[in-house]
Structures are given as C-alpha cells and as structure tokens.
Amino acid sequence: MDILLSILDATWKVIFIVFFFGFCIFIHEFGHMLAALWQGLHVERFSIGMGPVMWKIFTWRNVDFVLSWIPFGGYVALPQLDATDSPKTMQDEKLEPCKPWPRAVVAFAGPFFNILFGFVLAFIMWGVGLWENPKASSCIISSVPQSLPDYEKELSITDRLVAFDGEPTDLFADEICAKLEPGTTHSVTVKRGDKDVTFDMTTLANPEWEAGLRAGDRIVGVNGKHFTKGYEEFSMEYVFSGAYKVTVNAIRDGKPFDATYIPLRNPLMEGLGAPFFTATSPVALGGVHPNSPAAMAGLQAGDQLLQLNDTNIMGGKEFLELLAKMDGAPFSLLVTRNGKDMLLEGIRCPAPYTLHNFGAFFAVSVSSVVPDLPAKKAGIRRGDRILSVDGVEVLDSKQITEYIRSTEGKPMTINLVRNGKPLELKGVCSEKVEMEGGAVYLLGVTLSNSAPKVIGHPNPWAQFTRIVSQTWRTLSLLFSPITSRVTGRERGQATVKVEHMSGALGILTMMWYTLSSEGLRGGFSLIILITFSLAIMNLLPIPALDGCYILFSIIEIVIRRRLPYKLVNALVSIFFYLLLALIVYITFFDGRRIFRLLKFGSIKGVPPKVEKVTPDAPPAAQEKQNEQPVETKEEK
C-alpha cells in the first residue's frame, strides 16, 4: 500500500511539472502564432510538444497543428521572421519579407502571453492564498564565529575532520574555528577515502565579528532598509545588496548600532555573500492560557518575543532564564504582533518560573513531514505545534531534537495543538537512520522555532512587481562587472554570479521539492514566478531573444530601411550558440547541486554532522502534507 501511495504521489508531481512547466513555453509560442495570424504573416506549423512530428491533428487557416514526440512545450514555425531577404515556405514557395511593425508585434506577443498567463494564475492564487512567512520586523543572531576556516587552499567544505592539533575530533572546521583567534595556524587531519591527510591551516578573521556583531543582537535592517518577513527577507536583502560594504542595523541592550564591513564569499553557500553568523526570526508564542499572567499582560498567540526589559530574547530557554532572574519583580516585554512592535509593561510571573505557570507555550511548529518515517506514520502534520514530549515542556526545536535522540527508539507521548485543538499521540518511536558519518535517531519532521508559515493573499500586481524586482536585482548583479567599470562604483566580490542561476534542470528539481514541501500552493507560486520570469528574460535586447527582434524593428522604423540581413543573421547565430553554451554551463552547476543533494543531503555540498542533525529531512525527502495553515486575509 505504501509503495502504491508513493507511486501515486510521484505521478501527480510529474504530471503537474510536465504540464504546467511545458504550458509556460506553449502559451509563449501560442502568443507568437496568434499575433502572426493577426498581422497576416504566414504560419507554417504550430506544434504541441517538441521534436519530430508524431501526428498531424488538423489544419486551420493554412496552419498545420501537429503533435510532436516530446510532450513538453511547443513551437511555431514563422519563416518570415528568419533573417533573410527571401523567406520561403517548407514547399519552397517565396514569401514577402516581414515589415518592422508586424515583426515587433509578433515578437512582443510571446512574452505578453506569458504575462497574461501569469496574471490569470496570480488572480486565482489571490483568492486561494499563497504560503508566506509570518510578519517579523527583526531577527535574532544566535551565533557569530570569531574566525573562519581557509577553504581557498587544501581544506574542502566536504572534508570531515578526524583530528585537530593532534586531538581526535568529529567536528567540522567551521565549528572549531568559530572560537579560535584569527591568524593562528593549526594542524588539521581529514578523512579522504581510506586515507588520513594532514596539513596546516591558518584561521581567517570573520569581518562580522570584527565589526562588532555578537550572539543575542537583534537585527532590524540591512543597509538602512527595514524588513517585514524576518530572517528570510533579511538574508535575501543581504545577499542581493551587491554593495562593496554591507551595514547591518541592530539593537543591543535596547540601544541601536550599526555594524559595517566588507562581506566575504561564503563557501558553504556556493560563494555567495551570505552571512557566516546564524540568525532566526524571533521566538513566537503558540498560545496563551486564559486568566494566566501571560493573558492578563495582554499576550496573544503568534506574538513574537523581542526583549524582556532591555535584553534581547534569543529563544524559549533564554526567555525562561530571564523570567527566573526577575524573581517575581515586574518587567516589560517588547513583542511584535502582526508586523507591529508593542511594549507590554507591568508583567509579573509568580514562582515557579515555568511556561505553564506563566500561562503560555511556544510555537515550535512542524514545517514538513518526511514520508516513511515515524512522524508520518503517527499522523503528525505540517502546521502542528508541539507542546510537550513525555510531559517535558517544549522550549525550542533543539531541545526536542536532543530528547528524541536520547530515547533511542523508545515509545514517546507527544502533545500538540492542531487548528487550536489539543491532541495527544502515544507510542511514537524514533527510527535509527544511517547518514553520512554515522547513524542518528530521527522522528522525521522539520521543526521551526518561529511562527509557522501563513496563507497570505497578495494581489496579482503585488505578485508581479515582486518577481520583476527580484529578476531586475539578479540581472543587475550579473551585469555588475560591466556596469561597475562604466560607473566607477566599487562592487562587492561576494555577489551573485552566473553559476548561481538555475536552468531547466534546476527549475524542475526546485519544482519537485516545492510540491513535496508546500503542495499545490507552492507549485503554482513557482509557476507564476517561472512564467513572469520567462517573459522578462525574453524581452532582454539580446540577439536570439524576442527583445532583440523588437529592438531591431524599432531601429528599422527610425532609419526607414531594413538592417543588413547578413549582419542580423550573424548576430542571431553567434548569440544563439552563446546562449546554448550558457545553458550547458548553468546545467553543469545544476547537476552538481543535485549530486551534492543526493550524496550529502545538502544542496550546498556539506555533509550533515550526526551530532547536529535535526529531525529534518533533505528537501528531496519532504512530501506534500495536509495543510493546516494560519489564514490571514490581509491584501498587500
């Protein structure tokens, strides 16, 4: 039965990917065809699918509609758009060369139909809703490494250390270097195949540490720009800033400060300028008991805890420690509710200083459930909030992870909340799973300390402008080596490059994982992204793309004569092969990411460390779950 369900699960995903990804291409070509017929051009053939013709379906307005062997996308044959002064049909009949205006209309119609299709889907998802991160105006730094390992020489990010300075270890290099002084040299022994390789490594200074960032700092902005979606939005802004220097706007002990530094390329993130420090969105309350101190203070489910008096709250455990230090004295809490900061004052908590006595519980929620592991079999679902395990109050995901491992497969009782109703699961046993570097007991869930994702309802225009902004920023960073030379502006070395892009292979893989982890909502969200992006990319004025045909047509209208067809043909041919080479280049990196994902369980190529493996699964193992979202009706 499980095998049949797995086959059915894989089948619907394949059908979804092939149909909708192919439809993005199909609708593009369909737009070209309709515009060509409207402008009176000769349309030779319209194919559903690619490759050799399998079957001629029918003929309409002298256009052969055919079905091709590869059931993916489609194409339209328009001989009058070829760069020649004597276009011909397949029957060798001569045709009139296409004039500039009809050529521009036909070229624009393809991207235009992609945009129309995107808006149709965006309008539907406006009503249905899309997965979004809950609003959070800040994030909390949990750790900042003092030093970094040098991966530029002998050390590799996939190396597993067996000894450091002669002492046996099973830690990763970045974990050891985090507490070492920069510029110090150490002996490192790693396992490569069946051999132990020993060499010297000098630690590098971490610019984040030297700029003054520390664990417990609360980040409220980057480069002066504030965010509303917590750590995910912060990290995107950080990576896509493209600036030579980055300024992290933070708060410590109630006082704001700025940390400015030159970001380094992060080898653990494919050389992107991603932070080396770790941070999370603020810890959130999963609920508040009636008539409790928390309820009387005005706290509500979903509130994100930022500060107790002037001390930043790093997590649930730290909150209880701060609560105990108050020893019954009144205190204030700074919280975020629906994206707005609120100060609650005069709060008291009587002894003993536990969450139960305070009258609240944290939102340690299930982000995804792995098929064929105990959590799935026990009935745990995405969106469930875990309250306790074997009667032990849950403070954060790390606590649950450590407890699950300690049970070594013994039955557990898990208390959780689903749709506001308490639920108790008895006899849940973790399962021993062999992983890179050893075995670990897993429950089979991905946990989040912050509030779970919600279903938002962004209007179609908001969805479109967000994708246009993302695409524009990406293209700006890709072309920054050229633009920086022209403008003289310093650019960051840790920036987005061509190898960070995804081609068809990467997009298809991403769609599979998105369908597995976020279901149809996530899948349609990605299709909207793809069809809008396809339109934008095709409008670029690059030979062989639609945008260049539009540009050539505008030039011809202005100069009132046709551009030399040999020049146009040469440019189109050269750039066609350059684009083909670019696709091969990007596909190589897509393949490398997938290989690392399958081998290490990490798309970055870093094998998971057994002692730190959360009960998470790699994206490949995640599955579409019954969605138990928090609904928000706000339109943006």
Predicted feature residues:
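Internal alpha-helical transmembrane segments
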Residues: 27, 74-143, 254, 319, ...
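PDZ-domain C-terminal substructure recognizer with occasional recognition of PDZ-binding tails
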Residues: 178-206, 214, 220, 236-275, ...
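Terminal peptide-recognition signature
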Residues: 28, 67, 150, 158-161, ...
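Functional transmembrane alpha-helices
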Residues: 2-4, 8-10, 93-101, 270-296, ...
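Conserved PDZ fold ligand-binding element
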Residues: 151-170, 211-231, 294-316, 377-397, ...
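Low-complexity, proline/glycine-enriched hydrophobic segments characteristic of transmembrane helices
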Residues: 139-218, 334, 343-345, 406, ...
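Small-residue-rich helix-interface/hinge motifs
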Residues: 8-90, 537-559
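PDZ/PDZ-like groove recognition
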Residues: 121, 125-163, 195-215, 269-301, ...
